[in-house]
UniProtKB/Swiss-Prot annotation:
InterPro entries: DUF1450, UPF0741. It comes from Anoxybacillus flavithermus (strain DSM 21510 / WK1). Belongs to the UPF0741 family. It comes from the Bacteria. This is UPF0741 protein Aflv_2757.
């Protein structure tokens, strides 16, 4: 099954310029969907991504990438 990442292009805590290349590095074959994820409350304060329809968030992008990598290994 192919992994899917969904990220918001409008949330204040998310920097797509740095996050997208890192997600592609984690899984080059994953589908990446960019757009509003209706996760605005947490998205103001935390970096987040939906990984296979499950939200993953962290205070920093580095922490987020670590959490996503761990989730993909399961």
């Amino acid at each position: 099954m192919q992994n899917e990442f969904r990220v918001c292009d409008d949330c204040q805590a998310t920097n797509l310029k740095t996050l997208l290349p890192r997600l592609k590095k984690l899984d080059p074959n994953a589908t990446i969907e960019i757009g509003c994820q209706s996760y605005c409350g947490p998205g103001r304060k935390k970096v987040f991504a939906f990984v296979n329809n499950r939200p993953v968030s962290a205070m920093t992008e580095d922490e987020l990438i670590e959490k996503i990598a761990a989730k993909l290994k399961k």
